[in-house]
């Protein structure tokens, strides 16, 4: 059993997006990667795709999701599931931070325009 304490979890981020690495292969979990993401008001992810399914469980705040060119709103308690190779981005248009826990298969990669596929550091 592995417990990743909040104080010991690695942190990443810039431009109003902060990510805390939770479960991952480098932190004792061979098959699942999980992380917590916080988008400050006005912050957004770049449009990207993934090589595996990703699930976002919204904990607080609201977010606007663009998935395959369609707009969706996400609020606390909602779960967004994104299938592989579907372009999406998420942004916080609200006045409060948006927070979610995200999961995908270990080894899943992100693909951002102009970059090759990569395993995000919080999921490695």
Name these PLM-found stretches.
Residues 1-31, 111-124:
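A short, N-terminal "cap"/entry segment at the start of jelly-roll beta-barrel domains
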Residues 35-50:
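Conserved short histidine dyad/triad with adjacent acidic residue
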Residues 46-47, 65-66, 82, 88-94, ...:
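Short beta-strand His + acidic residue motifs that chelate non-heme Fe in jelly-roll/DSBH
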Residues 51-52, 70, 86-87, 96, ...:
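A generic "binding-loop/recognition-motif" signal
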Residues 53-63, 68:
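Glycine- and acidic-residue-biased ligand/ion/polar-headgroup-sensing regions
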Residues 69-85:
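Short acidic-glycine-tyrosine-enriched beta hairpin
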Residues 81, 96-111:
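A short hydrophobic beta-strand segment most commonly corresponding to one strand
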């Amino acid at each position: 059993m592995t417990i990743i304490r909040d104080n010991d979890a690695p942190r990443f981020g810039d431009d109003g997006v902060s990510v805390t690495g939770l479960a991952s292969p480098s932190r004792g979990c061979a098959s699942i990667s999980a992380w917590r993401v916080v988008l400050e008001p006005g912050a957004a992810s770049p449009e990207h795709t993934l090589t595996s399914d990703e699930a976002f469980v919204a904990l607080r705040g609201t977010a606007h999701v663009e998935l395959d060119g369609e707009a969706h709103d996400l609020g606390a308690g909602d779960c967004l599931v994104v299938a592989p190779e579907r372009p999406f981005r998420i942004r916080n248009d609200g006045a409060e931070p948006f927070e979610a826990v995200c999961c995908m298969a270990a080894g899943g990669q992100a693909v951002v325009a102009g970059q090759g596929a990569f395993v995000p550091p919080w999921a490695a």
